[in-house]
Curated annotation (Swiss-Prot):
InterPro entries: Antibiotic_NAT-like, DUF436. Transmembrane segments: none annotated. This is UPF0340 protein LACR_0494. The lineage of its organism: Bacteria, Bacillati, Bacillota, Bacilli, Lactobacillales. HAMAP family: UPF0340 (MF_00800).
Length: 180
């Protein structure tokens, strides 16, 4: 796989998704990543540390530059736990759990984030305002209600299907209510 091309395509996708989701500084963005799918394989069966490193590095830098927190979802072997900065866990009072991600228990995205983050910790539950799913990893459980699908500029990254979610407040009150 051409890693330079992957880097460029990842940048195009994350820039587009951030524009469409309108996520703000201080908010949380969740990433689900199957490097196996990006690599043209079946999720969980062809993990690539190099692919994870490229994708997470681009997304982490882009979000950090905007003051947005990145949460990287693990695979099902870690119950889809999330790797985040300890600062965020403390700020949100999210319970920290003990595990160090590995390529086949957590995934390439978590391994890359573990190396990039200043003080990485794992938590089991978060509420993110938006997210990006590379390879059909099912990030919806981590995105705040009400979730709205976002169609990224590219539907694929390598061999992986790409989708995204944003959220909005619930509309309550029925026909008498007014909304912005």
């Amino acid at each position: 796989m051409d890693l330079e091309k992957l880097k460029e395509e990842t940048q195009i996708i994350i820039d587009d998704v951030l524009k469409q989701t309108e996520i703000k500084s201080g908010q949380v963005f969740v990433l689900g990543l199957s490097s196996s799918e990006v690599n043209g394989g079946l999720i969980g069966h062809a993990s690539s540390a190099e692919i994870g490193q490229v994708i997470v590095s681009v997304i982490h830098k882009t979000l950090s530059d905007k003051g947005i927190y990145l949460a990287v979802q693990a695979c099902e072997h870690l119950n889809r736990a999330l790797l985040i900065e300890e600062e965020l866990a403390d700020k949100k009072d999210w319970e920290i759990v003990s595990v160090v991600p590995q390529l086949h228990a957590g995934g390439s995205g978590q391994v890359a984030a573990y190396q990039l983050f200043k003080s990485p910790v794992e938590v089991e539950h978060i509420v993110a305002q938006a997210g990006l799913d590379i390879g059909d990893t099912s990030i919806g459980m981590h995105v705040k209600h009400v979730q709205i699908p976002v169609r990224p500029i590219s539907k694929e990254l390598g061999g992986a299907h790409v989708t995204s979610l944003k959220s909005r407040p619930k509309l309550i009150g029925g026909e008498r209510a007014r909304y912005e």
